[in-house]
A protein has these predicted regions:
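Feature for soluble, non-membrane regions of globular proteins
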Residues: 1-202
């Protein structure tokens, strides 16, 4: 079965003023849609067809740039839309809060580490909060549409939170002020969803 562009759980203007409606529309209906169609074309008629996106990325031949770029773009954006919401939704679960404190000292320590990873990612890419095999948390960043599920990336684990720092994610509203966009991102994080994803990996 072909991959499909996921529908959003909210309207394009629902994240304003933190993320503007025009950016959301272009980001979802153009960029994510493009990754979806190009991924389907790249796997058509191959043994990759029919795999879940997670299995496809975990077993990826990293030299296959079409699947690497478009499969990464498909997965990354599908996660991104789920971990943001119109209002800063819910609170951290006790389990996730304790894990954050164990890994980063405090929530503010986590936020500072995550924000630095996002702000200092050179060029296009993503910053992630990942759950490693032992259950501990790690913050890392990846270039372009790479993500921690891919082999040999250097920040292994399952991402439960990600921020897109490609310019198309923020430039209409924030221009070159990436740190302002990162701060605004924290106003729309869906902590209930992030906590649920963490709990599922425990």
């Amino acid at each position: 079965m072909a991959f499909e562009l996921p529908k959003l759980d909210y309207s394009y203007n629902a994240l304003e003023p933190n993320i503007d409606a025009k950016t959301m529309e272009i980001h979802h209906s153009k960029h994510h849609s493009g990754y979806t169609s190009k991924l389907n074309s790249a796997i058509l008629g191959t043994d990759l067809q029919g795999k879940s996106i997670e299995a496809l990325l975990r077993d990826l031949d990293m030299s296959n740039k079409a699947v690497r770029n478009n499969g990464g773009g498909y997965y990354n954006h599908s996660l991104f839309w789920k971990v943001i919401s119109p209002a800063n939704k819910g609170e951290l679960s006790v389990e996730l809060k304790n894990a954050i404190n164990d890994a980063f000292g405090t929530f503010d320590g986590f936020r500072s580490t995550f924000s630095k990873a996002a702000a200092t990612q050179f060029g296009s890419g993503w910053a992630w909060l990942c759950v490693k095999n032992g259950g501990e948390l790690e913050v890392c960043s990846t270039a372009n549409q790479d993500n921690p599920l891919m082999p040999g990336i250097g920040c292994g684990g399952v991402p439960i939170l990600g921020i897109d720092v490609w310019e198309h994610a923020y430039y209409l509203n924030y221009q070159n002020r990436r740190p302002d966009y990162i701060n605004a991102f924290f106003n729309v994080v869906n902590w209930s969803e992030v906590s649920k994803r963490y709990g599922a990996l425990k």
